[in-house]
Amino acid sequence: INQLKKNLNFKLVIRNNSYFKIFIKKYTKSFSKYYYDYAPQYLKKTIHKFISSESSKQNSNYSQFTAVYFELRTRCNGTCSFCAASVQNEARPDILMDFKLYEKAILELAAMNYKGIIAFHVNSEPLLIKNLDEYISFARTHLSDAWIQILSNGKSLNSVNGKKIIEAGIDELSLNIYNDDLKAKLPKNIIKFEKEVLLKFFNKNQIYAGHKNNKPSGKFIYYNIFRRLLNEILTNRAGTAPNKKSNKSVLGNYGFCEYPFHQFNITANGNVSQCCCDLNFSNPMGNVKFQTIQEIWEGKKFTELRKNLLSGTRKTSSLCSQCDFFGLQTPPKNFLKKAFYYLLKHN
């Protein structure tokens, strides 16, 4: 910390002896390129909390969300032991989002000049949607600057639907390949897709790795394969993870969480969750059938939730109070860096 203070010329101010507020005095690109990337998670979390707090002062409705997730169908074909939406654990009704409802949401985002992420998963598998390409195409038509992402387990990917979603205009296809052996060969359907579709649509220099970034000029796709353990133990997902029990002795210590400040999750019946960990949308912030997206985002439920998280408590939410998610994604480079740049330039 002392070295950071010296090199970056910033001061730490303790408020109510509960958390640090960071005031940046001088803009340096070296901070974001080095110190932010390698800073401890708690320091990153403090930075994000400060950014969110400052945003709330400048705009009573907080900054706009950066990612909209559509759960088009409440189903997954995965068998992950850590997820209550997996085949062996699924207890939700099977609901498919009406296309008219989807159109309403996309047109509202277009009217807002939305340029963030559009994705088609919450706790679901997007490639189970037979006409997924139609949903993608509609979003691409009306949100030309948005980043359209497909995150899939790859089980239902084939040359036919793979070709359709690429032609419809996705920017990114990321595959989580779950297996007990992280060195196992890729599934045959993935190899076939790469050979018959991916490498026929794109030259190798048009295929990038990673997530949302500035769009390259010309033809491109971001393509990722992440090897994941089928029986991995992650967070308790607000108490819903089948393979991890909540540790009540530590649940009150996590405090601030970034999710309700940049996520907007819509499930098949139009309900909006407070975050992606609310598997059953049990505490809806609103419903896009009856309200606008902006009304929900700026509504009383979201506002109160954010205020409580900024004060460092999760106890006022039944979901948050039993969640052991640290409160910050890893690595959180894109969103936080952009927000950090903004603060540096405007202070």
What is each of the regions a protein language model found here?
Residues 196-248, 252, 277-328:
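C-terminal accessory region of radical SAM enzymes
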Residues 258-260:
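Short, small/polar residue-rich loop motifs at catalytic or cofactor-binding pockets
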